[in-house]
Amino acid sequence: MDTFVPTGRYKRTDLANIGTNVWTFEPVLALSHFDPKGGPELSVKLMYDFNTKNKATDYRSGQAAHVDFATSYNFNPVTIGVTGYYFKQTTDDKQDGLKVGADGNKGEALALGPLIRYQLGKVPITAQWQHEIFSDNRTQGNSFWLKAAFRF
């Protein structure tokens, strides 16, 4: 269970805010097939979001299902593949208890892009780029991720 807390500055009158002023509870199921000796890999992460109401605006974003996925081939020490996500809002946004807009302001998006991972000793370093192919009722853009995983 992932939990996102309302941290960061939030001001109702600002066009953009660092904080969200809501809690989000997100059950997660993640599955991966990975052979450290090399070969094909597949990872899927399923999530479902439950949002609380923003008390400053009386706005509640709808529930949403989303999946992160990656398929790749491990050549040791380099892995290359494709990564992406699909997001679909399943319930309407509501403000003052009423549906927002004719379609409930339901968001949907699909992104795809390349990934490359290099195994540096015991530390995997991954770079991935995701381009949103389409987006509805959400901002549309690109994401670039660079991550390293360390065991403690």
Question: Residues of each region from the PLM?
Answer:
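Outer membrane beta-barrel transmembrane domains
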Residues: T57-F152
